[in-house]
């Protein structure tokens, strides 16, 4: 048994992954690290060294003074660890450390191989300390687990148990300013570590931005670093009740820290931007900044409720900016796909607004961090409590300014042994569309649509990739002949467009039944982003019959984007909700999207998140409902200013009782929707049934105007029956 007291060795604990950064910080404070273990550094120094770490360490979790080691004389499998801990506690005279009138608490940690009921063992340590006091002075101290004057930290080991005085009291990450919390906040010392790793102070930024600020931790920690504010300046510590506490030394260190902070406040600070889509987070950030003592600096901090889609012009040209944020990863957002879309959208915004600037972004999975467009990226893995996180550091790559594919395409002479007519027609179509696509920035369009009877296929351009759909040939056509002709067409497509085979995706399109639109054709899941107007949209050219973006409704979506500002928008049979997305980006007061397919609603949410819009948020600005549209219209009462309905021609989904036929059922569908339309609102109705006729009852009840020609773009002029569309309003508006 060894009861020697060593007052010149200290343990400094930290979160896993911070050991290197913490060692650098401690050595900058003038203290040498003598030993390094996982989550713990050991230093040799004076009490002043320990106090300085308490005052100035932004990264440490605790500062522990080992005061008693209880060496085990023998160990065996049946050992009673709780009783060993009691024996170790009672064998030391604790009245040498603190007075019996002080309150205390026990924090017990057992090494991995030690099997012990920590709750019971903690009680036995408490009993040992109390019994030691009774033997020494005849009085016992009281337990206070919430605000003890003394905290004892006990490490249960394999060959010895170590009893420490916790000089920090509460964990050092508790700076005392966090009065208001948000979901899944990052600990203060981890936030500081990220800022230290990113060399915030050395970069001397003119702009500091946290676009998803939560409770404001990054902003406050950045303020503390840039104003030389000691993290321990205003918090309570665990040494005030310790007999060995040097009050004069501590007060002198405190005065020194206060003086340094006041001097640093005389220097100019960057402009801070703290944004969040949640008003509660914005409020929490403001209150926490005030609680941290930075109320006088609020004029330098723009704290606003903003989504990523609502960023202002930062005027960041020729300025040094620093971006740091903790996006709502994991359970706070939902599935992994939506998380990936969030990081893709954030990356695009950074590239546009802050090219060549430094950023540090937290991710829950490394795959999320990998989509960030950073030069020379570095990754730091940390533990935020029990959650592993990955921090990606790097310089933001400049945005790649792209033009529509046709803007750079040039017609070249193409000679084909066969399929020359097809090649000529495709080239003619592309030449005719080139000027329009370039002027209007059209990235996705139809290039060919069964123009020639012998080549019964559709060729669609999505960005710089082609989606080729072969219409199933009639039974009277020899399958081998049809296959040969299709292969000839593919060769002509490659020759005319200049695209290689990897950029061409092929499907065979048969007549749709009520469910096969939703049936997976493949499991490749090769989704990518295309641009349409202001919207970035995820498309999939492999997995489903449809791609996620109906090209023939482009003009309708752009029309909705122009008309949606300030309006409440309803999208029925919303598919991937691209019309809702355009409405949202066009400034709609709210969007509501209804579709029977959970698959497509999940895709819809990814589209919204990709564009910096919040989904499933408390303010219910953008809502998604997996429901039969007939029943949904019947059950609700909310009114909408703008409604878009694009129903299928026919549906017999298992989720839908009965069948839907657009010709048979459009009257009751439109009437139900008109009951949800405001008196001055507009409903757009469209469908792809070639034989569709609007019922006279609808024309008699409402103001009805067919606008088909206005909703078909130049790329579909060759197929005027691709869809039909109407504008419907309540009577008396025109």
Swiss-Prot record:
Keywords: Cytoplasm, Methyltransferase, RNA-binding, rRNA processing, S-adenosyl-L-methionine, Transferase
Single GO MF annotation: rRNA (guanine-N7-)-methyltransferase activity
Broad enzyme group: transferase
Record EC number: 2.1.1.173, 2.1.1.264
Annotated SUPFAM superfamilies: S-adenosyl-L-methionine-dependent methyltransferases
Record-annotated THUMP domain positions: 49-167
Catalysed conversion reaction: guanosine(2445) in 23S rRNA + S-adenosyl-L-methionine = N(2)-methylguanosine(2445) in 23S rRNA + S-adenosyl-L-homocysteine + H(+); guanosine(2069) in 23S rRNA + S-adenosyl-L-methionine = N(2)-methylguanosine(2069) in 23S rRNA + S-adenosyl-L-homocysteine + H(+)
Protein location: Cytoplasm
GO cellular component: cytoplasm
PROSITE patterns: THUMP (PS51165), UPF0020 (PS01261)
Record-stated family: Belongs to the methyltransferase superfamily. RlmKL family.
Function: Specifically methylates the guanine in position 2445 (m2G2445) and the guanine in position 2069 (m7G2069) of 23S rRNA.
Protein name (database record): Ribosomal RNA large subunit methyltransferase K/L
Gene name tied to this protein: rlmL
